[in-house]
Amino acid sequence: MDQIAVATFEKDIKFEGFLLARTSDQRTSSNGSKYLDMTLCDRTGDINAKMWDGTVTPPPVGAVVKVRAQITEYNGRLQMKINKIREAQEGEYDLSFLVPCAPYPAEEMYAELTQAVAEMRNETLQKIVGEMLRMAGERLMYYPAAQRLHHAERSGLLHHTSSMLRLARAVLTVYPWLDQDLLFAGVIVHDLSKIAEMKSDEAGNVTDYTVDGLLLGHLVRGVTQVREAARRMEIPEDEEYVLLLEHMVISHHGEAEYGSPRPPMFPEAEMLHWIDLVDARMNEMNGILRRTPAGAFSEKIWSLDRRVYHPHYAGEQDAPSPAPAAQEAPRRPRPDADKAYQGLL
């Protein structure tokens, strides 16, 4: 589609084109008037959008809309002021331009996980992790890792998990005394229960959280899924590695403030927490840099509680680069294709 990418929006430009509605609500202002408040996106990024006409019905979440708008700025952050909006008709747009996607094929990322399971020598962990991947099923191929924060993209859960797995391989070259099977198992299963926590369509757009997700959350549900997988594989629930894996799931947020009722209590659990945090924050920062010009600070990012600076990197253009999903994704070696790559990572 021939239209301006969200990642390259600048203040005062006019925009007419197609975008995907990630959130869509009718709200009431302090003076009692109604307005539309939406998050609209293409595959390069998203932007908050307002339409000050309270008579317009909010488009369904996940719908493609055609808008005519102007890019404004509010509290140092770009915002879209919509003048006209309508739902798009099939055939008017190219969905591949609108859906944020992981930069690598889902099948390739999934192969990295199954390769790690095949490498395991611990039969208990191998059986449990393999069964949990089977329990996740086809939804794992398209599910995002979050609704709005890190890896909020089609196949984002696989992107997050496979990136963490490569980071874990690198960590093991520095700390070879860690239990590789236990660390790999924790990485692969730690967020699988997000599939039960969120409602996502096949485009990777999360419309809401499930009742299960709101009442229990993915940490608690993850523990029950580890135990269920062990039961299915006829592994006693008092087997120590079952308990260790349950602890890794419930402690991977690190602190009670962030949802973990127990802090990590053994080295592999501690390492899982930091690998998870590093990968999530690097993904967020990468997205922030793509929409922030070199030499400028971003708006305050509430999830990081700070602004982020985009340095003048050598050889980089001043304008924000398009998101990786908008380019041809760099090809990574497959898990079984490059032993030198595996040795380094």
Language-model features: locations:
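Divalent metal-dependent catalytic cores for phosphoryl transfer on phosphate-bearing substrates
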Residues: 149-150, 159, 170-294
